[in-house]
């Protein structure tokens, strides 16, 4: 018999220890991975609810199982809030991840072998935008576009490629691009070749919800996003559209039964909570601080002589180009990690090193801002990072930096 007081600590000491260690790591490390964030206790409460027990294949009001009347309410809330938050007619909240949301779009709109125009992974795109190692690169004819010497998306190149190759779909969006994207220009290019415009806004969804970054929703046929990252919800995916009933039916069928079976109702409940939180004034203020903190860090890195890809940032992330410093991204990642500062190694444009080594690091501010970092704190943090990078391998500098990190983490806990 199941009892309410059952717990992991008394039953599975090994797993409980791992959970406790990760909890401590999150509290004592500064998180700068651009795709990571801290979700709220309310979201975690929803994810730990009894909704996890319910199988609900299908959609609200059209389920294949009985007993779905209450999970229907939860999913309807999530759908309505997503539509309200992003200004659209249609939302599918069932994708288990951003990659599965993207996969559903491919399935709904393309046939294997169709031509797709997507941002090169080496220039800031995502695996699912046509990387050869991903399903998108294996099953479709992908033509990559990139950024120019100034670090801006080269729309003229994109148009030339579109006119030459006549893609059926053009993909906008990125995983490592720090500038404003001209969604309107992308749609104009797509219209010239009668292509779908599909935008993956996963990295900037929170900024878009808060009005801190231009929305692609009025321009794209389909938009996808993750629900974590800047949106700060549970890990999951979301599909949005204003393109009409025929499109909505294709997308729904591609998610279920096309790519998934039963949805994760506890995660959908978490999404509903997160969308409600994203409509609060505090969330909008938070997103504004995310951008300010990123700009403050960029300014400090540049003052210390570090090259920033695209020469700045207009969102939550930026890339530090370490080629001139003769430091690998892998070594920078390890040195900063030893000082309790978590980043990820990242390729930079025209990177001479492999993706497993790289010549850069990607830095993002959603998580530090979530725990209360101000612009002054962000500037100070950038200085600490430069100290470590200027002295790669110097254990004394790493240890001194680690102590500073522990102090600020104690002052600004993730969960107070």
UniProtKB/Swiss-Prot annotation:
The keyword Amino-acid biosynthesis belongs to this UniProt entry's keyword annotation: yes
Gene Ontology terms: biological process: glycine biosynthetic process from serine; tetrahydrofolate interconversion
GO cellular component annotations of the record: cytosol
Site (Plays an important role in substrate specificity): 228
Family: Belongs to the SHMT family.
Record keywords: Amino-acid biosynthesis, Cytoplasm, One-carbon metabolism, Pyridoxal phosphate, Transferase
E.C. designation(s): 2.1.2.1
Name of this protein: Serine hydroxymethyltransferase 1
Gene3D superfamilies: Aspartate Aminotransferase, domain 1 (3.90.1150.10), Type I PLP-dependent aspartate aminotransferase-like (Major domain) (3.40.640.10)
Record organism: Vibrio vulnificus (strain YJ016)
GO molecular function, one term: glycine hydroxymethyltransferase activity
Compartments it resides in: Cytoplasm
Disulphide-bonded residues: none
CDD domains the UniProt entry points to: SHMT
């Amino acid at each position: 018999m199941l009892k309410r007081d059952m717990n992991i600590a008394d039953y599975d000491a090994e797993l409980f220890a791992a959970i406790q260690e990760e909890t401590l790591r999150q509290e004592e490390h500064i998180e700068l991975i651009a795709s990571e964030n801290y979700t709220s206790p309310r979201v975690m409460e929803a994810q730990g609810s009894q909704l996890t027990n319910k199988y609900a294949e299908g959609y609200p009001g059209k389920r294949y199982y009985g007993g779905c009347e209450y999970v229907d309410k939860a999913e309807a809330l999530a759908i309505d809030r997503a539509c309200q938050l992003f200004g659209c007619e249609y939302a599918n909240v069932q994708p288990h991840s951003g990659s599965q949301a993207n996969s559903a779009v491919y399935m709904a709109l393309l046939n294997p072998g169709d031509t797709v125009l997507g941002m090169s992974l080496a220039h800031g795109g995502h695996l699912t935008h046509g990387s050869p190692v991903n399903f998108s690169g294996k099953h479709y004819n992908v033509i990559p576009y990139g950024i120019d010497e100034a670090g801006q998306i080269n729309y003229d190149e994109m148009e030339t490629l579109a006119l030459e190759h006549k893609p059926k779909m053009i993909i906008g969006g990125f995983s490592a691009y720090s500038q404003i994207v001209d969604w309107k220009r992308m749609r104009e290019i797509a219209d010239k070749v009668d292509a779908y415009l599909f935008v993956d806004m996963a990295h900037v969804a929170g900024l878009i919800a808060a009005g801190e970054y231009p929305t692609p929703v009025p321009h794209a046929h389909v938009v996808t996003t993750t629900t974590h990252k800047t949106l700060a919800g549970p890990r999951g995916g979301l599909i949005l559209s204003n393109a009409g009933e025929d499109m909505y039916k294709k997308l729904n069928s591609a998610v279920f039964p096309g790519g998934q079976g039963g949805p994760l109702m506890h995660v959908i409940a978490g999404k509903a909570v997160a969308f409600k939180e994203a409509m609060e004034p505090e969330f909008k203020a938070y997103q504004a601080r995310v951008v300010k903190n990123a700009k403050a860090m960029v300014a400090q890195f540049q003052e210390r002589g570090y090259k920033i890809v695209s020469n700045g940032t207009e969102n939550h992330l930026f890339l530090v180009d370490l080629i001139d410093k003769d430091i690998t991204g892998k070594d920078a990642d390890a040195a900063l990690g030893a000082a309790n500062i978590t980043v990820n190694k990242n390729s930079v444009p025209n990177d001479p090193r492999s993706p497993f080594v790289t010549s850069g690091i990607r830095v993002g501010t959603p998580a530090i801002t979530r725990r209360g970092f101000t612009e002054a704190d962000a500037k100070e943090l950038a200085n600490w990072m430069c100290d470590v990078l200027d002295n790669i391998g110097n254990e004394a500098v790493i240890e001194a930096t680690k102590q500073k990190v522990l102090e600020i983490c104690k002052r600004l806990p993730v969960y107070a």
